[in-house]
Regions:
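A generic local structural motif
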Residues: 59-61, 163, 213-217
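Membrane-embedded, lumen/periplasm-facing catalytic core of multi-pass transferases
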Residues: 116-182
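Hydrophobic/aromatic-rich transmembrane helices and adjacent perimembrane loops
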Residues: 38-43, 61-63, 71, 78-105
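Extracytoplasmic
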Residues: 171-172, 176-224, 234-248
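Membrane-interface junctions at the ends of membrane-embedded or membrane-associated helices
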Residues: 50-59, 96-114
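Aromatic/acidic, Gly/Pro-rich catalytic loop(s) in extracytoplasmic/lumenal soluble domains
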Residues: 223-301
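Short, well-ordered amphipathic alpha-helices
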Residues: 46-49, 160-163, 187-194, 248-253
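Transmembrane-lumen/periplasm boundary regions of multi-pass, lipid-linked membrane glycan transferases
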Residues: 1-59, 68-78, 122
Length: 301
């Protein structure tokens, strides 16, 4: 079993699977420098060369090989996400420690200390954060993200929606969120109460629905979930044409067509948040195969 599972995972076409998340190489570089900074990476590169030539310090080569391999693996499959940058942290830490260990000039130590101070202070300066990776405009000399949490003006509305869903959806039933933007998605609803220190009144019942065409080929959850929370206009976060499954499913529910005919709206749950109309639908029967075929024909035309 393990061998078959391993072969299946290793032979998978990840480039096609995550094609919806693949942008330009420039986007990768802008994200990487946003969190690490050009100066920091450049200083480590120069110090590695100097240590290799003058100190015969070759351990840094292993760290650079590890980071370069990770970089090219991602460039060949998809654009980096913030979480993927953690792959580079161990090597960057070791490069920094080795570089500091070989510092013999006082001015170099002062310079490294000043750079560390600038990095530490700069990430706590309040600034407007991009809503997604494609909004990062340029490469950064020093890290220019903000450690301060993003404040939302619609927090009360999100909490009210979550509480309404908790009291409306029957115990044991599942809820799917047909929205995938940074304004509304399943993770926002799941984490709304914990992130604000509000005690949840029930266990999580939210399940993932298909969101990305190239990645989510199994549409079964969309046909079997007990409740669907639908946001209109369709909430997506990738380039046009990458999330047709979300857009077409929203069209079905808004027009009460094909797969949506298996559901009934729960009108008391309708609300508007930040210009987005949100409706809850309850499945009252199994999906008909004819409706599924009609819906999927729009996806794979």
């Amino acid at each position: 079993f393990f061998r078959d599972f391993l072969v299946y995972k290793l032979m998978k076409d990840y480039g096609n699977l995550y094609s919806g998340y693949k942008f330009s190489v420039g986007t990768d570089l802008k994200l990487i420098t946003r969190y690490f900074g050009i100066i920091f990476v450049g200083v480590l590169a120069v110090s590695s060369v100097v240590m290799a030539v003058k100190k015969k310090e070759t351990r840094t080569l292993f760290m650079w090989v590890q980071m370069i391999v990770c970089l090219f693996m991602f460039l060949s499959t998809q654009t980096h996400g913030q979480q993927h940058l953690l792959l580079y942290i161990p090597s960057l830490i070791m490069l920094t420690l080795i570089s500091i260990r070989h510092i013999t000039k006082e001015w170099a130590l002062v310079g490294i200390s000043l750079l560390a101070l600038v990095h530490s202070v700069n990430v706590y300066i309040p600034r407007t954060q991009p809503h997604n990776i494609q909004e990062i405009k340029h490469m950064a000399l020093i890290p220019n993200f903000s450690m301060l949490p993003v404040s939302r003006d619609d927090t009360d509305e999100i909490l009210a929606l979550k509480k309404k869903l908790d009291t409306t959806v029957y115990d044991g039933d599942t809820l799917g969120v047909l929205a995938s933007s940074f304004t509304l998605n399943e993770d926002i609803l799941i984490n709304a109460e914990p992130s604000l220190g509000v005690k949840s009144i029930r266990d999580n019942n939210i399940v993932s629905l298909p969101q990305v065409d190239s990645r989510d080929r199994d549409l079964t959850p969309l046909y079997t979930v007990n409740y669907v929370l639908v946001a209109s206009p369709a909430q997506t976060h990738l380039a046009e044409g990458s999330q047709t499954v979300v857009e077409e499913a929203v069209n079905s529910f808004m027009n009460y067509a094909d797969i949506a005919t298996a559901y009934e709206e729960v009108p008391e749950c309708e609300t508007v948040i930040d210009g987005i109309t949100i409706k809850l639908f309850h499945r009252v029967r199994d999906e008909h195969q004819a409706d599924i075929k009609t819906f999927e024909a729009r996806l794979y035309k």
